[in-house]
């Protein structure tokens, strides 16, 4: 890429806006990048004014990242194709349910030699059973390579500039450097690995475990029980990758995308928080999303459903009792208090 690299961020929620702070600053500071970074923003009206206009005038996403200034070179664009058409790097950071539709809109409208990177923690149901990784959907639809970025990265803490690490999974070494340059900052340290599938699967599965941690918090079962749920969750994550994505490295689970992300999400993430409220309030997950998340969606429950679909197809539900129980609690087939009985005789204990 001899010419300057154009960057587009597809998405402007809490995490998309937080990452825009880093990407915008790096694009402005580093000579290999075009300074102007476009950010696709789903248009909404806030107090009678368009959200894109507010962002471009005040350099703040007042809906999803209030109190944090975005770099002035990050430009909000309400039209997806317009935002993405000149991009050499497309950063996807939207709820995973939107990806197939967005890809359809972008097909044939982007540079043929562009690359993508997905920051999306979740996956889709494949036709005929199984799981479709978001990076695979993007590559299949857009005919471009897609890396992934996952880690212990709570959006508000990243926006505050607190130190953290992240993992980029990139199977093609030639893209590793430009992606690291784009995301690396003093407070946001990047490790690039080639085991992209395991990196991405970790990012999705940990949201299921975080729901379990939230149920434990809501039931006031204490730190020992929560630690057991986190450990069993990690073991099921490793086993899941082993079964469905053989050839992944165990060492990947010890990167930020694995155990670190699992810990932070089970103590600080929205999946944990809403799951705790699900136990204590008796309200539905849908109602709690509206109340607590400002219209944003949880990734844990739909991911648990997609994973359960896959496990059921292979007759493996009993080998993953934690994932199975969390799915059943999220869909009201079990009560939260039944969680511990479901994992008391975990295969790990046999």
Curated annotation (Swiss-Prot):
Molecular function as annotated in GO: glycerol-3-phosphate dehydrogenase (NAD+) activity; NAD binding; protein homodimerization activity
A biological process from GO: glycerol-3-phosphate catabolic process
InterPro entries registered for this protein in UniProt: 6-PGluconate_DH-like_C_sf (IPR008927), 6PGD_dom2 (IPR013328), G3P_DH_NAD-dep (IPR006168), G3P_DH_NAD-dep_C (IPR006109), G3P_DH_NAD-dep_euk (IPR017751), G3P_DH_NAD-dep_N (IPR011128), NAD(P)-bd_dom_sf (IPR036291)
Residue positions of the active site: 206
Subcellular location: Cytoplasm
Matching PROSITE patterns: NAD_G3PDH
Catalytic activity: sn-glycerol 3-phosphate + NAD(+) = dihydroxyacetone phosphate + NADH + H(+)
Binding site for NAD(+): 11-16, 98, 121, 155, 270, 299
Gene3D superfamilies to which the protein is assigned, alphabetical: N-(1-d-carboxylethyl)-l-norvaline Dehydrogenase, domain 2, NAD(P)-binding Rossmann-like Domain
EC number, as in UniProt: 1.1.1.8
Keyword Transport: no
UniProt-annotated binding residues for substrate: 121, 270-271
Family statement drawn from the similarity comment of this UniProt entry: Belongs to the NAD-dependent glycerol-3-phosphate dehydrogenase family.
Summary of subunit composition and partner proteins: Homodimer.
Protein name: Glycerol-3-phosphate dehydrogenase [NAD(+)], cytoplasmic
Gene: Gpdh1
């Amino acid at each position: 890429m001899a010419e300057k690299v154009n960057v587009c961020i597809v998405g402007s929620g809490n995490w998309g806006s937080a990452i825009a702070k880093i990407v915008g600053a790096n694009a402005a500071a580093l000579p290999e990048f075009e300074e102007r970074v476009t950010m696709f923003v789903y248009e909404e009206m806030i107090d009678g004014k368009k959200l894109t206009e507010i962002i471009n005038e005040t350099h703040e996403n007042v809906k999803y990242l209030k109190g944090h200034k975005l770099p002035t070179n990050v430009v909000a664009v309400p039209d997806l194709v317009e935002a993405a058409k000149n991009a050499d790097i497309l950063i996807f950071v939207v709820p995973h349910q939107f990806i197939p539709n967005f890809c359809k809109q972008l097909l044939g409208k982007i540079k043929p030699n562009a690359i993508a990177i997905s920051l999306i923690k979740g996956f889709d149901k494949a036709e005929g059973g199984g799981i479709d990784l978001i990076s695979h959907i993007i590559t299949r639809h857009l005919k471009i390579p897609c890396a992934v970025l996952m880690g212990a990265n709570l959006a508000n803490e990243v926006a505050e500039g607190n130190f953290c690490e992240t993992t980029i999974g990139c199977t093609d070494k030639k893209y590793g450097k430009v992606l690291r340059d784009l995301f690396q900052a003093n407070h946001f340290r990047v490790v690039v690995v080639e085991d992209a599938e395991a990196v991405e699967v970790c990012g999705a599965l940990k949201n299921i475990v975080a729901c379990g941690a939230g149920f434990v918090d809501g039931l006031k079962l204490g730190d020992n029980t929560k630690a057991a749920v986190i450990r069993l969750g990690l073991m099921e994550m490793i086993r899941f990758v082993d079964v469905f994505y053989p050839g992944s490295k165990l060492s990947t689970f010890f990167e930020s995308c694995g155990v670190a992300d699992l810990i932070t999400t089970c103590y600080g993430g929205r999946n944990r928080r809403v799951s705790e409220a699900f136990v204590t309030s008796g309200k539905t997950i849908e109602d709690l999303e509206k109340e607590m998340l400002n219209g944003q969606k949880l990734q844990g429950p739909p991911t648990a459903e997609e994973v359960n679909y896959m496990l059921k197809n292979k007759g493996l539900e009993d080998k993953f009792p934690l994932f199975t129980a969390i799915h059943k609690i999220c869909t009201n087939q079990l009560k939260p208090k039944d969680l511990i009985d479901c994992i008391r005789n975990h295969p790990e204990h046999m």
